[in-house]
């Protein structure tokens, strides 16, 4: 049974109102990809979730046993969630599960609940609210808005003894210079 679920928003994306573009791993423009800053976050998340020293920045964090990200589809071709955590998966020698796409949050949660240990999920921020509400069983135990400008949070859900269910915690990542120390 899953004991901890950590959820991050995909890394920074291209800004429609500026000259910042999405780029693929080879540096070619791709609007469905991370921005250069998103790629920086992706790289920093490797040691955030797999610290070389074995010491996490918070006791609420743990090394993932399984990693899920929103898979690209015809309706949502974005590769941002995948590329945000691909490096983490590679560093831990884990398969990155891309089976579910945006809009399939219920199927994602159903599968995550069958996984043992610790799960990391990277997803689109508005749909993260749906994922957390499905896990918690209500919309009162967690924030119901994730600002468009925030890419620097981790939401952690820890399984509690029955009948308590889940404990919700938020953590700032504090990985890049502009990251906020404040949670929602």
Model-derived regions, located:
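Short loop/turn segments immediately following the C-termini of beta-strands
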Residues: 124
């Amino acid at each position: 049974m899953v004991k901890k679920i950590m959820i991050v928003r995909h890394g920074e994306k291209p800004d429609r109102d500026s000259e910042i573009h999405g780029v693929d791993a080879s540096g070619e423009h791709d609007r469905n990809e991370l921005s250069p800053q998103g790629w920086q976050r992706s790289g920093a998340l490797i040691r955030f979730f797999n610290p070389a020293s074995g010491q996490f920045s918070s006791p609420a964090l743990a090394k993932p046993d399984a990693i899920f990200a929103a898979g690209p589809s015809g309706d949502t071709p974005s590769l941002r969630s995948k590329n945000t955590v691909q490096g983490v998966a590679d560093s831990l020698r884990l398969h990155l599960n891309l089976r579910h796409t945006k809009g399939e949050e219920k199927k994602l949660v159903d599968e995550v609940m069958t996984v043992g240990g610790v799960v990391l999920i990277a997803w689109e921020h508005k749909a993260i609210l749906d994922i957390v509400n499905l896990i918690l069983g209500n919309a009162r135990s967690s924030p119901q808005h994730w600002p468009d400008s925030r890419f620097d949070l981790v939401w952690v859900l820890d399984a509690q003894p029955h009948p308590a269910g889940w404990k919700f915690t938020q953590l700032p990542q504090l990985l890049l210079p502009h990251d906020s120390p404040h949670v929602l």
